[in-house]
Amino acid sequence: MPAPTALQRRPEEFAENVSEDVSMEASAVPLPEDDADLIDMSIEPGTAIEAAPDALADDMPMTDESGRPKFAPAKSIPLAFRHEQRKVPIPPHRMTPLKTAWPKIYPPLVEHLKLQVRMNIKTKSVELRTSKSTTDTGALQKGEDFVKAFTLGFDVDDAIALLRLDDLYIETFEIKDVKTLQGEHMGRAIGRIAGKDGKTKFAIENASRTRVVLADSKIHILGGFKNIHVAREAIVSLILGQNPSKVYGNLRTVAGRMKERF
C-alpha cells in the first residue's frame, strides 16, 4: 500500500504510458519478409468453397444407373521372376514304370505348364523348375501333384486330370486306420476290396467316378471331394466285413442320385 503522501498519476496518463510500451514491443518483433505466407483477405470466401468440389470430382468414382461405382481396370504389374524348384522322390518299385512312361509324362509338364523337368537317375527323383515362360503361379504345385500321383500307382492318363482340373484331390488311408487286422484277415480285407479279377474295385470306380489304387495295406483315391467320400464309404464297409452285394446296392443308389443331380 503506497504511502498517503506519495504522488499518484491520473488514470489517463497511466493508460497512455501502457499503450506506448505495447507499441514499442510490437515494433521490435520482426515481420516475415516473404509475403507468400500472409493471407490475402481480398479473396472472397465463396471462391475457395466453389473450387473444392471441382478438385474432389476427379477423385470420386463414376457410378452407373444402379448407383454402383465404376472403377478403371487395374494395370497389369509385371511379376518378379524367381526360380523355384521341387524334387519329387521316386520309390524303387516305380523307377522302371517311370522310365517306360517318361515320353508321356514330360510333354504336359513342359508344354502345358511351361516347366523345366528332368529325371535324375542318380538320386532317383524327378526335378521340376520354373522358367521365364511359366505364367501360372500354381504350375509347380500342379506338376508335383501329377508326378506324385504317378508314383502312388495311378495311370498317366488318370494323373493328367490333375493338371486339367482344379477340383481333384488324392486321399490316402490305410486299412488299419479303419480296423486293426493282421495276417490272413488283412489279406481277406484286401481281397474283398479288389474282388474277383478286380471287379469290385472297378464297380466302385465307375459308380463314384474316381480312381482307386490298392498298394498293399494303403488305399489311394483320386477324384472330386464328394466322389472320394462315396468311394471311401464303400471301401470302409467292405473292410468292416459288410456283404459285397449290399455294398453294390448302396453304390447303385448313390450313382442314381449323382446322375439326377448332374
Swiss-Prot record:
Listed name of the protein: Pre-rRNA-processing protein PNO1
Q: Name one GO molecular function term.
A: rRNA primary transcript binding
Residues covered by region (Disordered)? 1-34
Q: Name one Pfam family in it.
A: KH_PNO1_2nd
- Report the transmembrane regions from the record: none
Organism of this sequence: Phaeosphaeria nodorum (strain SN15 / ATCC MYA-4574 / FGSC 10173)
Q: Which UniProt keywords apply?
A: Cytoplasm, Nucleus, Ribosome biogenesis, RNA-binding
Question: Where this protein primarily resides, as one coarse class?
Answer: cytoplasm
Listed under GO biological process in this entry are: endonucleolytic cleavage in ITS1 to separate SSU-rRNA from 5.8S rRNA and LSU-rRNA from tricistronic rRNA transcript (SSU-rRNA, 5.8S rRNA, LSU-rRNA); endonucleolytic cleavage to generate mature 5'-end of SSU-rRNA from (SSU-rRNA, 5.8S rRNA, LSU-rRNA); proteasome assembly; ribosomal small subunit export from nucleus; ribosome assembly
Q: Which residues form the KH domain?
A: 183-235
Which gene carries the instructions for this protein? PNO1
The text of the family note is: Belongs to the PNO1 family.
Q: Mind telling me which SUPFAM superfamilies this protein's record contains? A: Eukaryotic type KH-domain (KH-domain type I)
